[in-house]
């Protein structure tokens, strides 16, 4: 939180308008499979137990982080561009990610770029 607040302050100090992005969603199963690739069954099970028995815990943590971005933006009076919805509105949003289930691929980055370009007239 403090890192975001510091960055926002720095951007304003330079006379610029800070803008934040929400996070793209995460494909929890793809991410779990990616980080556990090469693990034996016992190690995979250990990771799953650490997650409380559900791979969905990964997505829940990710969404909590995303919600904190919305809170920071609101408290700091910063415009936040919602890219989360751009992904979730696609039935096949998982196809917009690399094999790790977290980082957008080229098509996912294009979706982010389009969302930013569409929002910019309201920012400047």
Residue positions per predicted region:
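Alpha-helical cap/lid subdomain in secreted, periplasmic
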Residues: 1-124
């Amino acid at each position: 939180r403090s890192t975001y607040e510091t960055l926002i302050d720095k951007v304003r100090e330079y006379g610029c308008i800070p803008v934040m992005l929400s996070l793209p969603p995460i494909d929890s199963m793809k991410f779990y499979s990616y980080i556990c690739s090469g693990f034996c069954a016992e190690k995979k099970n250990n990771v799953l137990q650490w997650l409380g028995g559900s791979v969905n815990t990964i997505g829940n943590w990710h969404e909590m982080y995303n919600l904190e971005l919305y809170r920071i933006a609101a408290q700091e009076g910063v415009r936040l561009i919602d890219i989360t919805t751009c992904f979730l509105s696609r039935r096949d949003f998982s196809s917009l990610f690399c094999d790790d289930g977290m980082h957008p691929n080229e098509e996912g980055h294009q979706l982010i770029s389009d969302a930013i370009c569409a929002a910019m007239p309201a920012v400047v």
